[in-house]
Each structure stands twice: as C-alpha cells, then as structure tokens.
Amino acid sequence: MSTTSLQPFAPSFSPFPSTQSLGMAPSQTIGLDTLAEGSQYSLEQLQLSREAGNDAATATSSTSLRSSSFSKSTDQSVSNPSGNHHSNNGPPSDFKSSQRDPLAEARSAIRKNSTSAPVRRRISRACDQCNQLRTKCDGQHPCAHCIEFGLTCEYARERKKRGKASKKDLAAAAAAAAAAGSTSSSTANDGGPMLTKGHSPSDGRSSHEINGRYDPAFDAARTLTNSAQSQLQSHADVPGMVGMQNSQQPHSQPPLGAALDALHLNHFSALNESNRPQMSVPDLRTLQMLHPSGTNPRSPSAVLPSQGLNSYNETAYSLMNPQESNPASMNHFRLGSSAENQPPSFLGLSPPAQSPGWLPLPSPSPANFPSFSMNPYPSTLRYPVLQPVLPHIASIIPQSLACDLLDVYFTSFSPSHLSPLSPYVVAYIFRKQSFLHPTKPRVCSPGLLASMLWVAAQTSDAAFLTSPPSARGRVCQKLLELTIGLLRPLIHGPAPGETSPNYAANMVINGVALGGFGVSMDQLGAQSTATGAVDDVATYVHLATVVSASEYKAASIRWWTAAWSLARELKLGRELPPNTNTARQDGDRDADSDVDMSKRNLPSLVTSVGHGSGTPLNVTEEEREERRRLWWLLYATDRHLALCYNQPLRLLDKECEGLLQPMNDDLWQAGDFGAVGYRQVGPPIECSGHSMFGYFLPLMTILGGIVDLQQAKEHPRFGIAFRNSSEWEHQVLELTRQLETYGQSLKEFESRYTSSLALGAADNETIVDGGHLDHVSPSGRSSSTVGSRINESIVHTKMVVAYGTHIMHVLHILLAGKWDPINLLEDQDLWISSESFITAMGHAVGAADAAADILEYDPDLSFMPFFFGIYLLQGSFLLLLAADKLQGDASPSVVRACETIVRAHEACVVTLNTEYQTFRKVMRSALAQVRGRMPEDFGEQQQRRREVLALYRWTGDGSGLAL
C-alpha cells in the first residue's frame, strides 16, 4: 500500500461520517451509545460467540480457504471504487470471514429451536432525542416519540462500533504519519514548496479509493492556497515531530494507546476510519459557551456560525483555541508546542469562579443544542434571550419547551388588563416585549432565566411535564438546582472578566476579609450595580415566592431576607440621580445599534452603576422602571409577610419616600413612557389601577402602619404603656382615615371603569387598544368585537373592586380586633362585649359579602391566590368566634357569612393548596353547631378545634403561618 494515500489532508476527512446526510447536525453524546444495547442482546451475542468458537475448531481448513478467497475479493474491490464497501469501519476482513459461517449456523440453530412468538427486530438506530432520554424509538424519521412531544428528531450522532481498532490499520496509519513527517521536514530544510506528489489530484482520488469513503462534498477542503500550505509547514516543523518520527517504525504494530499517543489530537488522517472515538466539535463548542474567554457570562453568548460544517474551515474550528492568532491554521492538523498543549480550562467542566462547590451543575448535552444544526434544519429557538441559559438546560428540557415556558410566564389572566396567569408570578417586573424580542432582547443573567423557566414549569400543561406524572417534579428539581447554582447565593461580586485591577486588594477592608461574600469597595460606594445584580434580586423573588406558597414557609424567609437585603444594598428605593448628558464616543454610537429599538429614544440618564464612583453609564427609562417595580414588589411582600409570619417590617417608608410610584401596566408593557404624565412619589394609599401595584400596593402601605402598631402593642416592656396612652388612639384614628380614603378611591375607580361615560370613550383607551393587547397575551386578540372587550374590562374591574373591598374590611378587623385565634376564643378580657367587637363584627360580615362577590367573578380564586389566603383566614376568625359563642343564637347574616367563608376556603384549597387552609374543617364543625346539629363528642371537637388553631399563633412569640 502506498504511503501517499494516507495524508494529513486526506480529503475524505469529515467531522461526522460520510454515510450521514449533510443536513444533520454533527452532534454526538460520547459514552452513551454502549448503554443502548439491552441485556438480552448481550446474552444472545455471548451465546453466538461461544458456539462459533466450538465450530471453528472443526472447520479450520475450510475457513482458511474462504479467508484466502475473501482477501482476493477484497483486493479486487479496492481497485473498483464503485463497489460497496463496509469493512472500513469494522474489524479486518480475515476476522469476519473466519466466523461468518459459524455465526450464521448458530443463529439458524437458535431460531429453529425457539418455540416462542417471532422475535421483534431491533431497530438499527434510535434518534438523538430518544437516545439521550433513554426512551423507546421506532426508528422512523421523525419518530413517534418526537412527534408526540414536539421535539426535533435527528439522526446526527456518529455511528460507533465496539471493540478496538485493527492493528493493521493502526500500523499503516503510524507509518503514514512517520512518512509524512519526514517528507515535511526534508522539504522545509530544502526551502522548497510545500506541495508534493501526495497532494496531486490523482493521488487524492487514489487515496479516496483506498479509503473507500470518498465524499465529493468535502472537495473544498483540498483546495489549499500556498499561504495556507506555508502556515501548515510552520506548524508542522516543531521539535516534537522528530521525536515522534524516531519512536515509531513503519512496520511495527504498537498497541492502541501508543498509536494514539503518536498521533496528535488534531491529526486528521486515515485513523478516522478506525473504531476509536473522535473528538466531537459540537462538544467543544458547547463547552466554549460555558466558559467564554473575555466575555461577560451574564450576557448572551455569541451564537456560533449559522453555516454548516460542509468543510472544516477556520470558522468552525477556531473555537477549539480562542486565543489562536491565526485561525486559518486550524484548517490543518497542528502539533503545537508545550505551551499550546496545556489542557483548556473548560475541558474539566469545573464550576465557574465564585460558585459554591456544593452544587454539581449538569454538563450540557450537545444533542439538544440547535445552534449546531445544519442549514436544512433551522433553529427552534424562538426567543434569543434564552441563549445564556441554553448550555445549562440542554440536558433538562428541549428548546421548544423553554420557549413555551417563557410564554407561560408572560401569559395574562385577562385579555383586557394585565394580570399574571401563573399563581407564582405576583406582578410583572419586566416588559414582555423586551424579553421576547426576536433580534435584540434584554440582556439577562442565566440565573434569572432559569428561575423564570422554573416558575413557569410549576403550572405548565406541556406534555413533557405531565407524562409521566413524575416528570414535572423531576424537571422542576433540576431547574431549581440549576437556578441556585447560577445565582451563587450571597455572592454578588463581579463575575470573571469584570473584576477591576484592584479588586483583590479591596477584598480586605479595615482588616475584615470580605472576599467570600463578593463585597468590594467599588460596590460599597456605588449607587447601584450592574443589571446582573438587579436580575439577582428578581431571581431571589422567584425562589422565595414559590417556597412561600409551599409547605416550607419558614424556609422562604431566607430567600426573602436575601432579596430585601440586596435591594437595600442596591438602593432600589431611591431614584437614580439625573446628570448632564456627556459627549459620547464613536464606539458608543456603534454600540447603540445593538440596543433594543424600544430603548433608543428614551431619556438616558448618566450615573455610576457598579463600575466605581464617577463612571458614567447610560440608564434607560425602562431600566429605571424595572428598579422601581422591583422595589415596590418587595415593599408590598414585606408587609404581607409581616402579617403572615408575625414579624416586624424590614423595608421602611423612609427609604422610599422619594421613589416614583409604578406606572400603569398597560403603558409599561407597550413601552409608552412618554404618556405617563404626572406621577406621585412615596408609598400610595389610593387605588389607581387593575394591577397589583394599582389596588394591592396601597393596602400594603396601610397594613405596614397596622403591623407597626401591633408590634408596639406587643412589646414586652413598652407595650402596656403604649396601649394606655393617647398616642395609641391617635395612630388608630390615622389608620382608620387611610382605610376610608382607600375605600373612597375604590368607589371612584369602579365608577370610572364601569360607567356609561367611560364606555363611550373606551375605543380610545387601553382596555380596547389592540396595540396594547398585543403585549398582554395571545388571547387578547381573540375578542372580535369592542363590546366583548368592554364586558371583559367591566368584569375585571368588578373583580378588582371585590378583592380590594375584602382586604380593606380585613384590615379594619386587624386594626380593631385581635390577631390570635386562641386569644379570641378564650376571651379573657371580655373583648366580645366591647364596642370595638361590634365594629369589627360588622367588617367581618362585610368581608364575607365581598368574598361572595369574589366567588361570582372569580370562582376558583385564581386572580391572586398567593396573597389572598391570609386575609381570608384572618377575616374568618371573628365568624368562628361568633359561631362558637352564640351557636344556635347566631343571626342569619352571621350564618350566611360562615357558609360563604367555607366555600371560599374550599375554592382556595383547589387553586393553591396549603396546610393552614384545613381551617375549613374547623369552620364546618362550627357551622354545624350554629345550625343546631350538636355532635355527641362536642367536647372533643372543641378541643380538636383549638389544637388546629394553636398551630398558628400571633402572640408575642408566635410565628403565624410559618410552622
């Protein structure tokens, strides 16, 4: 065999086998194909091999004759390139011919002796998705599994066979490598040209014929210029080459490990025809996206070239060494120096800097990474904003499902006004269009994106999450672990590549080492930090919200505390100070072309944001509004959880007295910042809109005052003196006035959106504006007439008024009555006979009437399930007290109110099931007593009732709902 047929530039080289279609992605999952064979198949092969070994002893002469005849036919087939060859990727022909007949006879004997039903034939190959998910595949294209779950069905991974390579092929490859090295070195010493006979077109064709795997699609790889040849020569002429030539003899037969050591990793030669696994280019590209050098890991990674790997050009292989100054040399094999052969940092999949070692992140699988697919298979990534998190979720969920989950996150409850459909999205902090922009999305941290997918996966109805039933729990658990790992809790310093030169010196401040907590002097003096830090606060909010709605409410305080603390450090409660516009450099103008179109004409303000004091940075009005909405959301949840968990307030009114109130949600999603008009500052106390910031935030402002009053009253030393002073009465009157102001604004809000005058001009307002409906939900455009949209708006308005009225009455009860249910039932101070009890009882009946309206407009209580439970519970305690004390003498209004509360609790359990809502059992037993049905074990039921209520205490040391 001529040595010129095995050249380093063999045109038959392909990053994936030539038997594949060029339209498939050259991705593979190394090490998983050997697990695809079942145990039954392995036992059958073992039995066949044993019988073949027994038969081979009695058929030696015939086998040798067949072997010689088969070798002759093989030589003839080499001279005939049009023949079909299948021995290049398998073991030597002598081995196959020696066991062909015994194997065939053994198979026929097994089939004759089998009395069972016909054995189902195994498919030759499973698709990439089924292979990765370890599911059954029918071998079709597309297969039934991918069609059912809407996955991309591909057969792109490399075909691999078992066993080690043939010694003959390894020896020939080593000899060819040594001959090629000696030829290259002699040519370089003579100063002659690089081209030799081995690179002539005729020899190139003969090499294809001998290899038996000629593919004309890769002819472009043979057209090398003289400059490229000289670059190859410079890379090939290195000291390591001589050692390799001297150590390997042409006719020796080294073992497999020695042969692989002799050939460099990037030496693409006829060794690709053997059975050793090849380096997968998509694997390297995926790992490169995990640890990009010189880029911000919080920004979207650059998408890899869209063109396919039709030839191994410099673009496709430049990612293998991003520091290479001459990427064109990557077209050829390269025997680098010792400095170049250092193992890259990303090959070990070590966690990124500053990340905790307690969370093993799953390595991304390239099988589901659509950026590497060829041109005939377009990418399924509808939303480029997901690019930073794609390498991390590739082994968890498909790309199409990730896009669907992002849609679920931004889906609205109502087509007329914005209201999140997911019970775990309490308010919209970000603009939907900024996230779902097809070309210029918002730059997001991977942790925020992972948390959004995790929140949406809690309630999504996608088939991938519902079949089998355990799929949702498994996927949500993986997304949760990924979110925590990407968030790096309590570590919010600069990411790798963003650190300043004096960052290490700033890690020790006044003798205190702060490096473990990601604190630097630059950040302590800044007005804010980069957008990634704001994303971290939003990620904490997502984690805390879902945990708060579960049975682990006490654990949610950790996440809420982290969110409140980081928000205070970032000074989200303050407006960023405006500054004079500074002259922009040419580079800034060029960078402006990459900004979202909705942000270009916005008034930009210059401030120092996480880059040291005095560093100018343009902050758009959208980014300012994100900061405001994030603060006001944390402000509202702080007061809500202070009631739930019987805790003092964390965020004070003083911290945000100069902060603008959130803008209208419809205008916010439309990006119409110029139409906002006059805006008030400080905490609001009047209803102003349909969103959580419009009707619920004012109630939480008033609740904060009630919580402060309650904490002062329960103070162990000063509480008694405060309750008996005139200051107590003054504070109660002020809070009562604020509640009355809110009630009046609620009536004005209802009349403004439901009166005939408002309906006459509705065509020009946001409730029927099609442009705004595009930002609400896909179903917003389903209403065909203006009348139906107006009706939806009226229903939504009445539902908001019902919820606001109910919570307002509950706040009246909290202000005038007792919070703890056991103290209510014991009634040691005879509060039940006071005037304040009669006032509070009237508000309890009013709250029950509002609950009846809520059940009429929102039967399943899905409008605000995260917030509503505690107010329903606190509004029920007085009714329970009346039913327990009065029993059969209760008024019809009290009985009707108790029935309404029981219905509301049952509906609330269906929507958002939590343990404390078993209070409905207590209410049912009390309602039975009111109707005259006295059980025989009346004393036991009363004792059991108090045991249930004793779990949730609002006394001095009680923890409320946090068990």
Curated annotation (Swiss-Prot):
Biased composition (Low complexity): 8-18, 56-93, 178-188
DNA-binding region: 127-153
Keyword Transcription among UniProt keywords: yes
Keywords: Activator, DNA-binding, Metal-binding, Nucleus, Transcription, Transcription regulation, Zinc
Localization in the cell: Nucleus
Domain of life: Eukaryota
One annotated Gene Ontology cellular component of this protein: nucleus
Claim: Transcription is one of the keywords in the record: yes
GO MF annotation list: DNA binding; DNA-binding transcription factor activity, RNA polymerase II-specific; zinc ion binding
UniProt cross-references to InterPro entries, sorted A to Z: Transcription_factor_dom_fun, XlnR/Xlr1, Zn2-C6_fun-type_DNA-bd_sf, Zn2Cys6_DnaBD
Record field: compositional bias (Polar residues): 19-30
Main location: nucleus
Region (Disordered): 1-30, 46-121, 178-213, 322-349, 576-597
Biased composition range(s): Basic and acidic residues: 200-212, 585-597
One GO term of the biological process aspect: xylan catabolic process
Transmembrane segments: none
Pfam families named in the record: Fungal_trans (PF04082), Zn_clus (PF00172)
PANTHER family reported for this sequence: XYLANOLYTIC TRANSCRIPTIONAL ACTIVATOR XLNR-RELATED
Record function comment: Transcriptional activator of the xylanolytic system. Involved in the regulation of extracellular cellulolytic and xylanolytic genes and in the regulation of the intracellular activities of D-xylose catabolic genes in the pentose catabolic pathway (PCP) in response to the presence of D-xylose.
Family: Belongs to the xlnR/xlr1 family.
Protein name as annotated: Xylanolytic transcriptional activator xlnR
Organism of this sequence: Aspergillus terreus (strain NIH 2624 / FGSC A1156)
Lineage, top ranks: Eukaryota, Fungi, Dikarya, Ascomycota, Pezizomycotina
Gene it is expressed from: xlnR
